[in-house]
Amino acid sequence: MDTSFWVALMATRDGHHAEARELLGRHGNDRLVTTNHVRGEAWTFIRRRYGHRPAVSLLDALHDSRRASVSYVTPESEDLALRWLRRRDEREYSFVDATSFAFMRTSKVSQVLTFDDDFAAAGFEVMRL
C-alpha cells in the first residue's frame, strides 16, 4: 500500500477517496503491507494538508488493523533502492517509492494499491477498479 493510497483512504476530500474505500473492500481478505517509509511519508502529507487529527487517524488505523501491517525497510533494501535510483533518469522517482520497489522485489510482491503511476512504470501491477 503506497502513500497515495493511504492519503486517498484517510482523506474524505481526496479525489480518489471513494475508489480507495472500494478497493480496500475488494481486497479485504488479501494480506496488505506497507512500509515504515510509506507510513512516515503518508503521516507528513496528511498532517500538512489535512491536519493533525486525520494524521493520527492514519497511525491508529495502521496500529489497529487486522489486515494491514507495517514492514521495515532494511538497510539492504535501502541500498538496492539507492542503486536503482542512480540508474534511473526516465522519471522523477521518489526515494520512498524506490524503497517500496526494493521491498516489493525482495518480498516477491507484484501488486500494489496506489494512485501513483510510477509503480506501473517500475513494472508493478497497480490494482484498480
Predicted regions and their residues:
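Short, well-structured N-terminal submotif of metal-dependent ribonuclease cores
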Residues: 1-34, 47-60
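Acidic, PIN/NYN-like endoribonuclease modules and their adjacent C-terminal/linker elements
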Residues: 101, 106-129
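Active-site neighborhoods of divalent-metal-dependent phosphate/nucleic-acid chemistry enzymes
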Residues: 69-111
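A general alpha-helix detector
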Residues: 5-6, 41-42, 80
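Short glycine/serine- and small hydrophobic-enriched flexible loop segments
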Residues: 44-47, 105
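Short secondary-structure boundary segments
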Residues: 36-37, 97, 116-117
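Short, hinge-like loop/turn segments at secondary-structure boundaries
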Residues: 50-53, 89, 128-129
